[in-house]
Amino acid sequence: MWLNSTSLGACFRPVNITLQERRAIASPWFAASFCALGLGSNLLALSVLAGARPGAGPRSSFLALLCGLVLTDFLGLLVTGAVVASQHAALLDWRATDPGCRLCHFMGAAMVFFGLCPLLLGAAMAAERFVGITRPFSRPAATSRRAWATVGLVWVGAGTLGLLPLLGLGRYSVQYPGSWCFLTLGAERGDVAFGLMFALLGSVSVGLSLLLNTVSVATLCRVYHAREATQRPRDCEVEMMVQLVGIMVVATVCWMPLLVFILQTLLQTLPVMSPSGQLLRTTERQLLIYLRVATWNQILDPWVYILFRRSVLRRLHPRFTSQLQAVSLHSPPTQAMLSGP
């Protein structure tokens, strides 16, 4: 345990920052501007989604999952951004604003929840498209209701994991420079176990998305380029895969550096945290940088949908419409071709 004043909660540990540094970087405007950019991007995507015609079948299911992803990103930026901006306004003095650590525990759980949800939803979307493209007749028809049930399951799963430190497995602590709370990169078994659970679950989600999307794209390409093919994928099939691949690339670039850093830090032989709870200065700064990179995932996700819609793709590539007409992959002749040698 860390040595703290008895009047303070258990989330406080020594942080490598002086009062002068704290005052120099304690500007709420950067945090507020960053949050406003993300909120505006997600609101724009939600408005575009609201005006989309989902129809029925795979597209309605995909749009429901995508709406769940954008809504999650919006709420994540709203909740965590408000806390970060308030702490910057308080000159990063978390002890003065939250001595009992209630806000810190709330933000730590929110960081885990809103961090894992996009990765899990990305994997769920990849699985939905994988089954829809490669095995369209092996499952019940995709519906938006089933998709929203999947979103609900992801929320419950991520929320349950985020509550574990409040139940005794792992700890949330104030992180450098004092504007946010996150899981503790300590050497205690609970900290290591919880950190590994978070990083491994996120990494597996990204890896699963990569695998399933690769197979789905390869299947679409095989159908499109097959010489004997008389039918082509509909443009909506290609549109959904382009958007899904874009979401996967954004999640990989934004989140994998942080997840790998957490794994390396927790598994290395020499602990990076002293018995008093102080992290190495380089470790604290690296964690902050990787966290900021990961936050861009919530800002870029909505732009993947906004920019990779059919209407935009047609303007960028006029042949997109003429090349990708015809019936869906879900017709029996196409399925026979997909299941062929």
Swiss-Prot record:
Protein name as catalogued: Thromboxane A2 receptor
Matches recorded under InterPro entries: GPCR_Rhodpsn, GPCR_Rhodpsn_7TM, Prostanoid_rcpt, Thbox_rcpt
Spans through the membrane: 30-52, 66-86, 106-127, 148-170, 192-217, 245-268, 288-309
Disulfide bonds: 104-181
Organism: Rattus norvegicus (Rat)
Keyword Phosphoprotein appears in the UniProt entry: yes
Membership in a protein family: Belongs to the G-protein coupled receptor 1 family.
Xref: PANTHER family: G-PROTEIN COUPLED RECEPTOR FAMILY 1 MEMBER, THROMBOXANE A2 RECEPTOR
Superkingdom of the source species: Eukaryota
Pfam families on file: 7tm_1
Membrane topology, record value: Multi-pass membrane protein
